Amino acid sequence: MRLILLLSLFVVAFAAELPLAEECDETKCLLPRCRCSSTNIPGGLAPRDVPQFVSVTFDDAVNVINIETYREVLYGRSNSNGCPAGATFYVSHEYTNYVLVNELYNRGYEVSLHSMTHQTPQTYWAEADYDVLVKEFADQKSLMSHFALIPDQEIRGVRLPFLQMNGNASFQMMADSGLVYDNSWPTVSHVNPGLWPYTLDYASIHDCIVPPCPSASIPGPWVIPMISWSDLNGSPCSMADSCYFTPPLDDENAWYNFILTNFERHYHGNRAPFGFYIHEWYLAVNPAVKAALVRFMNYVNNLNDAFMVNANQIIEWVQNPIPVSEYIRRPCRRFSSTPCRATSCGPLRSEHNGLDYWMQVCNTCPRVYPWLGNPLGR
């Protein structure tokens, strides 16, 4: 209780520098730049006319081990409209192989930010000020663009470590750094119907599960709510691998039905985006869960009105909502691939802990291992 009080005092102090968000005025908060937090479908569409977006995401470092899972379960997939199926990777820096990050980007998947350090304790993230968050995320954007050869403007999203909210500071950092959306904020109160993405121009109805949550008016960044699943006991879980009462981990059919039940709450409801949020290790140690995910993605890829997409594609649709009958006729997403000249670097001394690291990059080698305050390792 004392921790929550301290965190609340911290966010109030920071918010003093920013205007307090007021109740949303729908006559002033208009697409494409502003949207009130609401379970109402963008554009006033009927549920049957809404494309059901599915957001498959993976967190943490990309390496030679987990890339095998990504290649196995994701590569070569297409939605029913013929466009490539998307997924989003929230990448943390330490131990990441940037040649493989480049591979994911060139396959059309979205690469977003999960911090430079992903350090513990969790209170570090709750208490981090604006300057710390610039070093953790804005500098990571520069690092990712440089070493994985991803165009700076293609790196758009953030997921805070441990889903630990930070009040206003993280969103202010995003607004100043050209970052488009956050996908860290769980909701257990706005699940059925689900909470659609929105901006922070005005006060949010979003329940604050991991305080402190933003209180200021911060135009620019979007929130993609992490709409919780319900486990077999009816308890909420923000990520698939955080559910407590699950089917047996060796029962593929039971897990498939578990995923499908949570999906259908969206699909037969207001069609707010459905998230399958997970860490790769959970699939690696539970082959039946991996097989269930593959079956579920196969199912989605054969539905005429459901689409696996990158997270930013959800924001783009919300900004310009069109019926599914039009959506399926739109051209597929286009982007410029960036060929990588793979370079192995190391040993690189880390100035933060004195250890030696090896890096795989698509650029010239850094002098030292990149870290806070020195994202390019110069």
What are these regions (language model features)?
Residues Q122-A126, S235-C237:
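Short acidic, glycine/proline-rich loop/turn micro-motifs
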Residues R2-A16:
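Cleavable N-terminal signal peptides of Sec/SRP-targeted secreted and luminal proteins
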Residues A126-D129, L195-Y202, P323-S325:
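Short low-complexity, flexible loop/linker segments enriched in glycine and/or proline
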Residues A311-Y357:
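C-terminal regions of proteins
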Residues P197-H266:
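Aromatic-lined glycan-binding groove of carbohydrate-active enzymes
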Residues L9, L18, E23, K28-L30, ...:
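Processing junctions and N-termini across compartments
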Residues E17-S112, T117-Q122, Y130-E136, K141-H146, ...:
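Active-site beta->alpha N-cap acidic-glycine motif
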